Swiss-Prot record:
Catalyzes the formation of acetyl phosphate from acetate and ATP. Can also catalyze the reverse reaction. The lineage of its organism: Bacteria, Bacillati, Actinomycetota, Actinomycetes, Mycobacteriales. Homodimer. It comes from Mycolicibacterium paratuberculosis (strain ATCC BAA-968 / K-10). It is found in: Cytoplasm. This is Acetate kinase.
Length: 387
């Protein structure tokens, strides 16, 4: 591939602690010229010892797809950054000063921001003549109403340490809400929506027009819905209780809540296909995990129906939301009195692209809307660079 077609492309990088995902995107037409993932970064016996090696391998994979970044019309590298704190909430061109400030904010997202910064620093070194832009997961939720963003704790402490509800998966929630409006051929500003991003990480949002009114994740991505490995909402006293009675350290409890809780903590597996197999075999732990997951999901749907007052559309997205018809059914079954009438035939039918799964006479339209965070990030990059 060369730039002779005149297309402008953005290389989108999502750098995690043990994996690096990449996609070369044409932001105008939404076409991905190449996509891939480098895994097992830094693991023992892994051929990818660090993020420098990971990005070089990604470049090799791009070359294998016929992509030469020097001639591919590359105009920007977009980096997904989970947490921007109160400082960064719009797409931001990366320079040394911005990166230094992001390092200072890593305490707010110690599991996510440091590997993202490693990816940024390597990418800037390997592609020094291209603009690098950070797009923040927290950005869309920066302007949550104070009643939703504020925790009822000591105000002085909260202000001093920037403790508030930040929300995450914001790029996905914004993109899906826009795609839902386009699918319905209705103005975005006139719609009230609930978006359910259900993957290994899960989050919900209530959105009025272009403004989010609430979201399930909080100071960190640990709060809210039950997830693959994360607990979601718990009584905060569980932390001190385990420290005092089980002799665990705070870091140990935090690690347990992030990595050994949620569906995997209850059932031993986090893949919903495997969970379904265990349920069908009569595994009680798997059934309990599924019941806890859907119970929490239904609670948030009900809460956000109340927050919005009137709801036009509910959209399911991400890996589970897009592909698991049973989760969608169990999330809204019995809610006919609340205006949600699912069409089970439509729900079971597959298909690509956005599709309606509610009955035609359902007061609230229910959709499946594939997310595309990479495309949204690419478009944000072009926008901030004045393209």
């Amino acid at each position: 591939m060369d730039g002779s077609d005149g297309a402008r492309r953005v290389l989108v990088i999502n750098s995690g602690s043990s994996s690096l995902k990449f996609q070369l995107v044409d932001p105008e037409f939404g076409v991905a010229a190449s996509t891939g993932i480098v895994e097992r970064i830094g693991e023992e016996s892994s051929p990818v010892p660090d993020h420098d090696a990971a990005l070089r391998r990604a470049f090799d994979m791009l070359a294998g797809d016929g992509v030469d970044l020097n001639t591919a019309g590359l105009v920007a590298v977009g980096h997904r950054v989970v947490h921007g704190g109160n400082t960064f909430y719009r797409p931001t061109v990366l320079d040394d000063a911005v990166i230094a400030r992001l390092h200072e904010l890593s305490e707010l997202a110690p599991l996510h921001n440091p590997p993202a910064l490693q990816g940024i620093e390597v990418a800037r070194r390997l592609l020094p003549d291209i603009a690098h832009v950070a797009v923040f997961d927290t950005g869309f939720f920066h302007d949550l109403p104070p009643a939703a963003a504020t925790y009822a704790i000591d105000r002085e402490l909260a202000d001093r340490w920037q403790i508030r509800r930040y929300g995450f998966h914001g790029t996905s929630h914004r993109y899906v809400s826009e795609q839902a409006a386009a699918f319905l051929d209705r103005p975005l500003r006139g719609l009230k929506q609930i978006v359910l991003h259900l993957g290994n990480g899960c989050s919900a949002s209530a959105i009025a027009g272009t403004r989010p009114l609430d979201t399930s994740m909080g100071l960190t991505p640990l709060e809210g819905l039950v997830m693959g490995t994360r607990s979601g909402d718990i009584d905060p006293s569980i932390v001190s209780y385990l420290c005092h009675t089980a002799g665990m350290g705070v870091d140990d409890v935090e690690s347990m809540l992030n990595h050994r809780s949620g569906v995997v903590g209850l059932s031993g597996v986090r893949d919903f296909r495997r969970l379904r197999e265990l349920i069908e075999s009569g595994d009680g732990a798997a059934q309990l995990a599924y019941s806890v997951f859907t119970h929490r999901l239904r609670k948030y749907i009900g809460a956000y129906l109340a927050v919005l007052g009137h709801t036009d559309v509910i959209s399911f997205t991400a890996g589970i939301g897009e592909n698991d018809a049973a989760v969608r059914r169990d999330a809204v079954s019995g809610m006919e009195e609340l205006g949600i009438v699912l069409d089970e035939r439509r729900n079971l039918a597959g298909g690509k692209g956005a599709r309606q799964i509610s009955a035609d006479d359902s007061p609230i339209t229910v959709l499946v809307v594939p997310t595309n965070e990479e495309l949204a990030i690419a478009r944000d990059c072009v926008r901030v660079l004045g393209g």
